[in-house]
From Swiss-Prot:
Active site: Y374
The species this protein was found in: Emericella nidulans (Aspergillus nidulans)
Residue ranges, annotated region (9,12-octadecadienoate 8-hydroperoxide 8R-isomerase): 654-1081
Function comment: Bifunctional heme-containing enzyme that oxidizes linoleic acid to (8R,9Z,12Z)-8-hydroperoxyoctadeca-9,12-dienoate (within the N-terminal heme peroxidase domain), which is subsequently isomerized to (5S,8R,9Z,12Z)-5,8-dihydroxyoctadeca-9,12-dienoate (within the C-terminal P450 heme thiolate domain). Oxidized unsaturated fatty acids, so-called oxylipins, derived from endogenous fatty acids, influence the development of the asexual conidiophores and sexual cleistothecia and regulate the secondary metabolism.
pH-activity note: Optimum pH is 7-7.5.
The protein, known as: Psi-producing oxygenase A
Length: 1081
């Protein structure tokens, strides 16, 4: 208390002295004669670093260091270090006169200002969420920027004084452009790349013939050739039903005057759009696309429009990704490397020490200069040159193109276009006939696409435009003149490229250089068009130069690509899962593990799902001809990953639905063969040695039967049932204890992800000595969830590879993880094979679970067969393990889902009673409850291929099956067949156990059937003991699933960004505490 008083006295004394000093200073001031009102002029006093240092300590220095580091690196700030508060402390602690304090405060204010966009570029509301038909509203503050009907921008100031008497356009064509000798593209780029370029060009440029300063299309990559330039055109291609486009249609008429490969690409985008809206409606993320009754006209119109507009965003998103990941990669020759680098303008950037980040979502307006940059007629192939000549003769019969005036040419094209029907479904396309549903025959479209992929395009450069394009090129030259565009050199200087000083700089070909000299007198006077297309073309460079276009064009198109994508709100700030939905966003995203991030295959395989193998070279790399792709991919060591077969129709399997027919087929091993051998061998191939051919499910030969017998003997040893029951009871309980939690006092767990899936992982890793990392085995390699994903990938690749669009990605990923797991499993098996020291191995692995010795002894029994360790692992252990985990987890989750459903929950009280009774009789009934629940939620279909012609009777209908035809035994319908299961929708505990079909039937019936029944009914018993077992409220308590062909369910992963054959997540709740674990488990 005394010290406080002394401190207050001293402080007061200091204040008094300070006040006296101020009074003395004031008394010494001169009179205020500098102002008219008799006041003193206030003098600004600023202090510098010297005075600041007396107010700064080590903590402040550290604060400044961290601020400087953050500004330099752009790394996120760790706000738990209180950096902002420490900056405030530093600024507040400096003298009020400190110059540095003022600068620090300014920097702080600048940072806070820059945290937010001024003005914002992304907004809520339906009006802002979707593209407008005419492209308006991309920039909310300049809504007409880039809209259809806007005037072209001018990029370059035309300062050079040119003579009004410029060379005749047709003379220019004959001197500089006319094709004399056809040259293939030096990098063997296919015509498909230039068909895509045609779509891009006509997406951005469509000069209004009534006012050639105006473009009738938007300045955005919004697929307007498909969707239309305005609302009227868009309405013509819409069905106004379920968000769909009219089948195999596109809005623009102009494309009908191009080689049919261009139209095929647009039809492919049309099909992709319709595929997307089907999926969006089926998934209905967060109820976003809940379908109203069609009688409610206004609500249904909103539903249809929401689906259509979202589908357009998604389809345009794939279009942009194809441009950036396939088209630009090929242009830059990166496709010839294994690099995943790409020029993606959507990259997020922040201001840094090297300058400000490029702006984003600003909008765009195309310029007249770029209109002439994209005239690539030199690259038209010989095949398309002939097509164009034939087309010309068709629309202007009897007219010689070489003598046709430009006026007559324009008039002839106008008459042709005016004669096309307004209704897109009625417009002719390449002589193809529409089917009753309005679509074209897939065979015809695929044939056109195949021929386009195989057609090598022409090379860029002078003297390479087909003669048939003389009028087109002459009109282009005249149009550039009417726009008063700058010269070639002015355009180059705009990009900071050195101007051409001589005609030989423009083109080293003496003839072209001389012709330019005679036409223009001086390099500075060469017009931008035809200048940009008669320039010398770049050489090929890997990577760097793949398109091998003219020098100036090669620079301009990259700048344009960045501006078009980075300036588009819908490809940047509004390109999010929230706008597109999680599934759609993921569907169009590149995966660097597939084709180094290229995505063209996503379009091809969705448009034509019944013609291509999932690894078809025609689908994955269509922008280069197949023969050249073979050289490229061989040099990269990946050619064997792809199929080089030409596309051909793949027949659909015939679904068999009756129980009797399914059982008959599955039992008839002579006529109907299993189909999984090729997939198993693909996954198990090791060091160019084929493994897996003799695995039990790989075929129907004697070695396959021997595999089944050997694995059965190894799995089912003495007292296996008691050991399996004990394992599943304790493992399930342990996982419940480990992964359950309380929410507001209520018990909850993700029963699928954290219990059902993981229990099978533990069982499989114990039985087969797989390297699982757990508390009891900390030296394992794979975490529980990792090993589950590996096993699920293996199972899906072998048995559920049904989605052609994901097939390649799935198979490559499954093979990679299979190889990793196999190598680690080999290490364990080889130790046993070489030493036989089982006990030492058990100790080394730190295993303490109830099945650890079971698994080690099982491997020893397999080795006793005399087979090499490699054969044991790659042909028998890995395929068996891969067939167990995900399948068993699926069965249990489906069974539990039924008993938690409205129709099945009435059985829970009896299951609860039986589970607590804990008698053999009660356990038998629980097994029957499990089999019934699994039957009622079955999602299994088993394929077989007919080895010879036969007839199958299915539900009273005789089906003729040809040799080589695949039949699909639909066990979903077989499990609900009333002839085998009377009252099929009810749970009945007295059914014949031999009739259950969901484990298969016949010689390839699930080998682990008895293990599975025992283990999974034990899990049901553990869960059944919990009181008031129920779903968690809301969507988290449901299995997210959709019905596929034949009623076979497909599930969605946790974030609903993709489909999977297996349940992924479902949360349950219960009352009371969990039973105690055994101490020694």
């Amino acid at each position: 208390m005394g010290e406080d008083k002394e401190t207050n006295i001293l402080a007061g004394l200091g204040n008094t002295i300070s006040q006296v000093e101020n009074v003395v200073a004031a008394s010494l001031r001169p009179l205020p004669t500098a102002t008219g009102d008799g006041t003193y002029v206030a003098e600004s006093t600023q202090t510098g670093l010297a005075k600041d240092l007396s107010h700064v300590d080590l903590k402040d220095v550290r604060t400044l260091a961290e601020v400087v580091k953050s500004a330099a690196t752009g790394e996120p700030v760790d706000d738990k270090q209180y950096i902002m508060e420490r900056v405030i402390q530093l600024a507040a602690g400096l003298p009020s006169t400190s110059r540095n304090a003022a600068e620090l405060t300014k920097s702080f204010l600048n940072m806070l200002w820059n945290d937010l966009e001024h003005p914002p570029v992304s907004y809520l509301g339906a009006d802002s969420m979707h593209r407008k038909a005419d492209g308006s509203g991309n920039n909310r503050f300049w809504p007409q920027l880039g809209a259809a009907g806007s005037a072209y921008a001018r990029s370059v100031r035309p300062k050079t004084m040119q003579s009004p008497s410029l060379p005749d356009p047709e003379t220019i064509f004959d001197c500089l452009l006319r094709r004399k000798e056809y040259r293939e593209h030096p990098n063997k780029i296919s015509s498909v790349l230039f068909y895509l370029a045609s779509i891009i060009i006509h997406d951005l440029f469509q000069t209004d013939p009534k006012d050639n300063s105006v473009s009738k299309t938007s300045s955005y990559l919004d697929l307007s050739p498909l969707y239309g330039n305005n609302q009227d055109e868009q309405n013509l291609v819409r069905t106004f039903k379920d968000g769909k486009l009219k089948p195999d249609c596109f809005a623009t008429k102009r494309v009908l005057g191009f080689p049919p490969g261009v139209g095929v690409l647009l039809i492919m985008f049309n099909r992709f759009h319709n595929y997307v809206v089907d999926q969006l409606a089926a998934i209905n993320e967060c109820g976003r696309f809940t379908k109203p009754d069609e009688s409610n006209v206004d609500e249904y119109a909103k539903y249809d429009n929401n689906l259509f507009q979202t589908g357009r965003l998604v389809t345009c998103g794939l279009y942009a990704n194809i441009i950036l990941k396939d088209y630009v990669r090929t242009i830059l020759n990166i496709n010839r490397t294994d690099s995943t680098w790409s020029l993606d303008p959507r990259m997020e950037m922040k201001d840094g020490l090297l300058g400000e980040a490029a702006a984003m979502a600003t909008g765009n307006q195309v310029s007249a200069e770029f209109n002439v940059v994209y005239r690539w007629h030199a690259c038209i192939s010989k095949r398309d040159e002939k097509w164009t000549e034939d087309f010309h003769r068709e629309i202007m019969p009897g007219v010689d193109p070489s003598t046709l005036s430009m006026q007559d040419f324009v008039a002839g094209l106008g008459r042709w276009q005016a004669g096309l029907p307004q209704e897109p479904l009625e417009r002719p396309f390449s002589g193809l006939q529409r089917k009753p549903d309005g679509a074209f025959n897939d065979d015809d479209l695929v044939n056109l696409f195949e021929k386009s992929v195989e057609d090598c395009a022409g090379a860029f450069g002078a003297s390479h435009v087909p003669a048939i394009f003389k009028s087109v090129e002459a009109l282009g030259i005249m149009q550039a003149r009417r726009w008063n565009l700058g010269t070639l050199n002015e355009f180059r200087q705009y990009f900071n490229l050195a101007p051409h000083k001589t005609f030989e700089d423009i083109n080293s070909d003496p003839y072209i250089a001389d012709q330019l000299k005679r036409l223009y007198d001086h390099p500075d006077l060469v017009e931008i068009y035809p200048g940009v297309v008669v320039e010398e073309a770049k050489d090929s460079m890997v990577p760097g130069s793949g398109l091998c276009t003219n020098f100036t064009i090669s620079r301009a198109i990259l700048s344009d690509a960045v501006a078009l994508v980075r300036g588009d709100r819908f490809y940047t700030v509004d390109y999010t899962p929230k706008h597109l939905t999680n599934w759609a966003y993921n569907e169009i995203q590149p995966n660097n593990a597939v084709d180094q991030g290229q995505v063209f295959y996503k379009l091809v395989l969705r448009a034509f799902p019944n013609h291509f193998d999932g690894n078809s070279i025609y689908a994955h790399f269509p922008l280069v001809v197949p023969s050249e792709n073979e050289k490229i991919l061989k040099s990269l060591g990946v050619a064997e990953k792809y199929s080089w077969e030409k596309p051909s129709r793949i027949s659909h399997p015939i679904f068999i639905s009756s129980h009797a027919a399914c059982m008959s087929i599955l039992e008839n091993q002579e006529t109907f063969k299993v189909t999984w051998g090729r997939k198993i061998e693909f996954l198990m191939q090791r060091d160019k040695h084929q493994y897996g051919k003799d695995f039990m499910l790989s075929g129907d030969r004697p070695p396959n039967a021997a595999s089944r017998k050997m694995m059965g003997s190894a799995l089912y040893r003495d007292e296996w049932e008691a050991e399996v029951k004990n394992f599943y009871e304790q493992t399930t309980l342990k996982l419940l204890h480990k992964n359950s939690y309380k929410l507001a006092g209520v018990n909850q767990v993700d029963i699928v992800r954290d219990v059902a899936n993981l229990a099978q992982v533990h069982f499989c890793s114990s039985v087969f000595s797989l390297p699982l990392k757990t508390d009891s085995n900390p030296r394992g390699i794979f975490a529980e969830s990792e090993l589950y994903k590996i096993m699920a990938a293996v199972f899906t690749a072998i048995f559920y590879d049904a989605d052609i669009g994901k097939s390649f990605e799935l198979n490559q990923a499954a093979r990679t993880v299979t190889q990793q797991l196999g190598q680690l499993t080999m290490a364990n098996v080889e130790i046993i094979a070489k030493t036989g020291l089982i006990a030492n191995l058990v100790n080394r692995l730190h295993r303490r679970d109830v099945l650890s010795e079971y698994g080690i002894h099982m491997i020893q029994r397999l080795l006793d067969s005399g087979l090499p360790a490699t054969e044991i692992v790659w042909t028998h252990i890995l395929p068996t393990a891969g067939g167990m985990v995900a399948n068993q987890a699926q069965l249990f989750s489906q069974c539990l889902d039924y008993y938690l459903s409205e129709e099945g929950s009435g059985h829970l009280p009896e299951i609860n009673r039986l589970a607590k009774e804990n008698t053999p009789e009660a356990d038998e009934l629980l097994t029957r409850y499990f089999m019934e629940g699994a039957r009622l939620r079955s999602s299994v279909a088993l394929p077989r291929v007919a080895a010879q012609p036969t007839v199958v009777e299915d539900n009273g209908e005789k089906l003729t099956i040809k040799a080589g035809q695949v039949v699909m035994c639909n066990l979903v319908s077989a499990c609900m067949d009333p002839t085998a299961f009377p009252d099929p929708e009810k749970v009945k505990l007295d059914r014949d156990m031999n009739l259950y079909a969901h484990f298969g039937f016949g010689p390839h019936k699930c080998l682990g059937l008895d293990l599975c029944k025992t283990g999974l009914s034990t899990m049901l018993k553990v869960l059944g003991r919990l009181d008031n077992l129920r779903r968690a409220p809301g969507a988290q308590g449901q299995l997210k699933k959709l019905s596929g062909p034949g009623g076979i369910a497909k599930y969605m992963n946790e974030d609903q960004s993709g489909f999977t054959p297996f349940p992924s997540t479902m949360k349950i709740q219960w009352d009371g505490e969990l039973p105690q674990l055994k101490e020694d488990f």
